[in-house]
Amino acid sequence: MPPRRKKKAAAAAAAAAAAAAAAGKAAAGKDGKAGIMTPKKPKKGKKKIPLMKYRVYIRRVLTQVRPELGISSKSMLIMNNFVVHNFQNIAKEASILAQYSKKKTITVKELKAAVKLVLPHQLLEYADRDGDRAVHNFESETSKKNSQGRKRGRGQQT
């Protein structure tokens, strides 16, 4: 009979140990370490897109046009929001136009059409003229750099 008592005692001790271990794990957390807090994983969802800040560029344009004038922080915030809002609207319209034409790339053609849809008439004229000038300057600069690189050859640039 003594062996039976040992089995009962061993079974009771094992049950008590299992209960204590389960209680310890519940108190400690999923990893089983008591007293250590593990950080929760961030929820996966839409990433917040940071808004661009155009303050520096707005100030540069202001000093070019009217160097004697300043701008308050509230006015700067309004101008920044205006620029961000217009860029977002133009980008949205350009992406819709690219989808209509079944293209994955937004080209100059889609951007021009989007600007025509978003901006009023007089702003459209200025934007169209200055945009054409900027594209022309960019293309002429890149063609100059490419032609200089070809004349000198590879590895011989100084």
From Swiss-Prot:
Keywords: Acetylation, Chromosome, DNA-binding, Nucleosome core, Nucleus. Can be acetylated to form H2BK6ac and H2BK33ac. It comes from the Eukaryota. It is found in: Nucleus; Chromosome. The keyword Nucleus applies. Core component of nucleosome. Nucleosomes wrap and compact DNA into chromatin, limiting DNA accessibility to the cellular machineries which require DNA as a template. Histones thereby play a central role in transcription regulation, DNA repair, DNA replication and chromosomal stability. DNA accessibility is regulated via a complex set of post-translational modifications of histones, also called histone code, and nucleosome remodeling. This is Histone H2B.1. It comes from Lilium longiflorum.
